[in-house]
Amino acid sequence: MMDPLKVLEKQSGFLRLLVYLSDKKEKALTEILDETDIPVHQLYSSIEKAKELNLIKTRTDSRKYPPRNLVSLTAKGKRFSKKLEELIRILEKD
């Protein structure tokens, strides 16, 4: 049987990304890197995983130079991140 804490540790960048985006409308990748402690390689793999699960969407804003890569939660991602925040609150209670 897999240890749930080990699974969470491996997915910590993924989970932190979703919690971080939960109260944001849309964020640039550079802002996410500046405002979180998620390592760059972990951030990119977390974004790909979350996109595959339809939890986030990405787009490029070309109106500014240099173009900015933007990330936001999908409706499914918002529901997921709210549940995740509930679970975190349960863990923090004791």
Where are these regions (language model features)?
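Beta-hairpin "wing" of winged helix-turn-helix
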Residues: 53-67
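Short alpha-helical segments that sit at the start of domains
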Residues: 1-16
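Short, charged/polar surface micro-motifs in flexible loops or helix N-caps
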Residues: 24-27, 77-79
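Short amphipathic alpha-helical elements of helix-turn-helix/winged-helix folds
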Residues: 17-24
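Amphipathic alpha-helical dimerization/coiled-coil segments
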Residues: 75, 79-94
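Short acidic, hydrophobic short linear motifs in intrinsically disordered regions
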Residues: 26-35
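Short amphipathic alpha-helical interaction segments
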Residues: 38-52
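Intrinsically disordered, low-complexity basic tails/linkers immediately adjacent to helix-turn-helix/homeobox/MYB/SANT
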Residues: 64-78
